[in-house]
């Protein structure tokens, strides 16, 4: 299945209806990043392991039957100016190389809810 051209609403619906898992979606995106990143250089930081861990958590949570947010299980890319506790927030400068935040910014928490 080529999910690249599907709108986010369709991806979310397929995840809710168990036609697609977060792991499958993330594996697809990882394959595309692996294929094109050396030429595009779009990522300041990319952690495949963390992405797949979060996808596994999302799929497990979905199976529990508990209420989910509309974007549950959909991976979201953030600019490195958005504060996160589990990824570097370097703001595009070597002065902040490897710096992380003690907590997520409000927008990150909203996206995760």
Segment roles from a protein language model:
Residues 2-113:
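Gly/Ser-rich catalytic/binding loops embedded in alpha/beta enzyme cores
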């Amino acid at each position: 299945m080529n999910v690249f051209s599907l709108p986010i609403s369709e991806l979310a619906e397929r995840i809710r209806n168990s036609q697609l898992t977060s792991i499958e979606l993330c594996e697809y995106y990882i394959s595309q990043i692996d294929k094109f990143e050396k030429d595009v250089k779009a990522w300041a930081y990319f952690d495949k392991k963390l992405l797949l861990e979060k996808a596994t958590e999302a799929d497990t949570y979905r199976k529990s039957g508990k209420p989910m947010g509309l974007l549950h299980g959909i991976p979201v890319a953030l600019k490195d100016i958005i504060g996160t506790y589990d990824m570097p927030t370097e703001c595009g400068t070597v002065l902040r190389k490897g710096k992380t935040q003690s907590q997520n910014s409000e927008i990150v928490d909203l996206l995760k809810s």
